[in-house]
Amino acid sequence: MTSLTCGAAVITFNGMKHLPQQLDSIATQTRAVQHIVISDDNSTDGTWEYLENWAKHASIRVTLVRNQPQLGLIANFEQAVSMVEADIVFSSDQDDVWLPNKVELVAAVFERHPDVQLVHTDADLIDGSGRELGTTLLTELMVSDRERIAVREGKAYEVYFRRNLVTGAAAAFRKNILDLARPIPNVLYHDAWLAFMASAVGKVHLLDVPTIQYRVHGSNMVGVEIGKRKQNMLEKARSFYWALNGKNELAKNINHALSRRTVLYERLSSHPELSPHYKAMASEALQFAQRRQALVSTPRNPVGRTIAVLRNAVRGHYRKYSAAPWSESLRDILNR
């Protein structure tokens, strides 16, 4: 079994509150990373000065980069992962904590399965003070057995067309998928984009155990809505009522989906070596988003909308490309 080199890409911005604990957790892994790239987006709270001192004493090779002016989240991430010199790249937020055997567990999956391009894992959720919240990332995302089976059977892309399950802080990928993934578009989160790219060229593996403590607080770049799965029927009905009466929000969401699916289809279409089936799904998903956009852009016509929605439903498009098929189809019919 081939031994792979591992590296970490850490992006920072004004992260002094939690950064020392995160860096210590990376540096004390049971299986060491060979290279750490830390790309700082022009912090002003002492983060950069701390990084310079930390790098001088680190036992691991460290590359520091300071962006002046700022690049923003996605461009900073792309810069960091591109600079890592390793077979496997572990992406890292500045405020989480790696469990001691994270690299060991994840690297073993890549070494056992050469066709796996990306591994993502569960995470224990903690609050801003580091207290455990008694739940995990996949639990709060309400990942179903059906979704787990699809990923395990090499059909992760069928899941990702409906919704993203990959959180970058709990993921690692083979660096060579950056050949397809770059440049990373700014119309969707980089972890969702990498999940699509990985599933286009190989398999994705869901490691159903926590490998990090994921910090949930008000400053999260990408947060988790704790407790959503515990809503009672009245709360769900109230949420659905407001969704039905939010035409502008619905149009915004559909336009966003259209932008995401456009860039995905264009990227896949520019690579003839990729699976025709995957490209066909990307094309179908794009056409579905285009039809939904046209639907909500026209004056409300319950009969016409119902016919259009039923046509999409019969084709299986809501089931294949919507995270909540029933509620989204009803919104398309009833939204004012």
What are these regions (language model features)?
Residues 1-231, 330:
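Nucleotide-sugar donor-binding/catalytic module of glycosyltransferases
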Residues 160-161, 186-188, 192, 204, ...:
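C-terminal subregions of glycosyltransferases and related glycan-biosynthesis enzymes
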